[in-house]
Structure formats: structure tokens, C-alpha cells
Amino acid sequence: MASLRRGFGSDQTTASDTKMHYRQLAPTASVRVSPLCLGAMNFGEAHKARYGECSKETAFSIMDYFYSQGGNFIDTANGYQAGESEQWVGEWMKSRDNRDEIVLATKYSTGYMNHEKDKIQINYGGNSAKSMKVSVAASLKKLQTNYIDILYIHWWDYSTSIPELMHSLNDLVVSGQVLYLGVSDTPAWVVSKANQYARDHGLRQFVIYQGMWNAAMRDFERDIIPMCRDEGMGLAPYGTLGQGSFQTEEGRKQREKDNPGRKFGAKSLPYVEVSKVLEKLANAKGKAITDVALAYVLQKTPYVFPIVGGRKLEHIQGNVAALQVALSEAEVEEIEAAYPFDAGFPHTFLSGTLFDGAKPTAAQGPGDVFLTKWQGDIDWVEAPKAIRPSGQ
């Protein structure tokens, strides 16, 4: 057996040799990715007034560290930093000669030529076939590659038909320019309709959804997560750290005083209240508050790959450490008790909490439907659970 293992290359690097173990992207996508996805929105200087400053040297050091820890999943978009983000990621992959090791995601839909004011802008954005064609061609050039692992539509424009969208995306897959399809910032009903159209016509389906989700902004849980579970899709949430709004009490006071970095993001009461619970749990575990915030989304449901990004190397170093933070069910419940999340109708109708004055909760499966319970006691198969931190 030992000789057989040697014959199959047992001296090759295994998952245990790296800091991060890999996971399958989705039930419908067998590509293997690191549990964290490195977001490259901050890589560039064109929009530093909005996002804060990040030099090319710093961006390369962040990507080098992420790669050294086993990170192979990188997310960018056609319009980030007026195209500099894609350019820098492409230059980094070229200089490190590691393109085929990286699972590279980019997006189209946002107008990416806005910085060239002399051009007619109208078809450089949106979901149309033309916008898709010119954007992908430009992205391939900037990224210095001949294929994109995951192409997202960046947001739904409410004007492109499902047939036009899915046939155009499928053409990119058939041509070899794109391997997998993703969708971002789009209503759940649109994604379900698009995937059903793709199934009915033998086309490639969306396999991953990207959207905003964190412990103080849980709308993702209302329809997006159930839809992805049913469609066999992965989840790539952004804003998992509250866009910097999850702060310790001391950090929050200091930030209000200095106001550095990005100039937007929620500062509402839910973030303050959730931060208090995150800080309490972090102190008890000897971890950073951001570690607990990341652990929350990682351990809520399977196939979750948080997009983590920052302008400083220490940001991503801290994010990798969060993979070893385990939360109990009681700790998750404590976080969720910090502010009332109402899943709304029909979810609270199905759970029965719409009528009984109890805390509003959503029915997550057949065992939660109160009218079914009236018919008798039923033992249901449990839904798949998230992967726990290694060693837990």
C-alpha cells in the first residue's frame, strides 16, 4: 500500500500542509476553493477617496500572504477602481506564475468605462449580451488570462430577458472563456427562474450567489439562503465584518474620532448592539471581534465562502485566524438575540410566530411548519450543516 501511495504521488502537498483546508464550491460545482475568498475591491488608487488608500506594493503583499496560507479564491470586478483591481490581480498572477492555481471570479454589469468621459457609456453596463461581450473581453485583457473561473452578473437590471441572459452566458461557457456562472445582488425569484430556464434548455446554471450578509444585516436568510440550498448553489457573502462597523467599544469611540478609511457603511443601532455581543464572545475566547463575526456566517449554513478584503496586510492575517473559531448553538443564538430580525410573511406565517406574539422566526424546513405539526409527530431528516473548524 505504501508503494501504491508513492506511485500516486504521496510526496505532493496535501491540505494538511497548508493553513487552509479546501472545500467544494457548491453541490453543483466541484471546483475546490479556500474557505475564504480574497476580495480585491480595494486594490487600486482610482477610488482611494472612497475606499481608502492601498498601494500596489501593499496589494501584492496581501495576495502573497493569502496565497502562502493556501488561499486560492480571489474576487474582483470589471469596474473596481476604474479597472485597476483587475489589472493588479492580473499582474500579480503573471509575476507569480500561478494563474491556474487561482480560482478567479470577476463580474460584469456595472459600467466600467465611466472614467473615459468621451465615450458613449450606455452599453458598457447592464446585463445585456453586448455589455457581457465587451466587458468579458476587457476583463480577460486586464487579467492577462484566457479564461475566467467564475463570472458573476453583478446586479439585476430588470430589463434583460432571462433567455437573452442565460443563452449569452452559456455561450461564454461553451467557448471556454468562462467555467462557472455566478449571480450577485439579484432577487431570489430571478435566480430561480433563470436556473429553471437553464435546466429546461440544457444550459449552464448559476452555481454561486454573492450578496451582503452579516450578523447585524440578516436579510440574506429570508429568501437567498433557502433558494441557494434548494438550487445547490454556494454563497459568497460580502460585508461580513459590517464594512468596518463591527467595533469594540474602545475601537468605535476611536473611529468616530479619527474617521479613517472608507466613507460609507451602516452605523445603525443593530451594528452597535451586535458588536457588544461579538466583543463579549471574542474576549471570552481570546479572539478578535472580527474573528467571531466571520465565524458566525461560516457556521450558519454550508457552502459559505465569505469575501474578505482590506487595505492592510494585518486585515487578511486576522481573517485567516477566524477559521479556527468555533461557536456553539447557544452563542449563535446570543448573537442573534442582539437585535430583532423579522423574516416577514410568509415565513412567519409558516412558523406560526406571526400569530402567537412570539419572537418572529422563519420556517427553515418541514419540521418548522406549525400547521403540519397539528397532523401528528413526524421525524424529519436534518438539513446539511456547515463544516466545523478543523479539530472541533
UniProtKB/Swiss-Prot annotation:
> What does the record give as the active site?
Y80
**Chain intervals for the UniProt region annotation (Disordered):** 242-263
Q: Where is this site: Lowers pKa of active site Tyr?
A: K107
* Listed Basic and acidic residues bias regions: 249-261
Enzyme class label: oxidoreductase
User: What are the binding positions for NADP(+) in this chain?
Assistant: 75, 184-185, 210, 239-249, 311-319
Short name of one Pfam family for this protein? Aldo_ket_red
The induction field says: Expression is positively regulated by the dothistromin-specific transcription factor aflR.
Q: Name one GO molecular function term.
A: oxidoreductase activity
* This protein's record includes keyword Cytoplasm: no
Instruction: Kindly tell me the pathway this chain contributes to.
Output: Mycotoxin biosynthesis
* Recorded family membership: Belongs to the aldo/keto reductase family. Aldo/keto reductase 2 subfamily.
Q: What does this protein do?
A: Norsolorinic acid reductase; part of the fragmented gene cluster that mediates the biosynthesis of dothistromin (DOTH), a polyketide toxin very similar in structure to the aflatoxin precursor, versicolorin B. The first step of the pathway is the conversion of acetate to norsolorinic acid (NOR) and requires the fatty acid synthase subunits hexA and hexB, as well as the polyketide synthase pksA. PksA combines a hexanoyl starter unit and 7 malonyl-CoA extender units to synthesize the precursor NOR.
- Protein name from the UniProt record: Norsolorinic acid reductase B
What species is this protein from?
Answer: Dothistroma septosporum (strain NZE10 / CBS 128990) (Red band needle blight fungus)
Name of the coding gene: norB
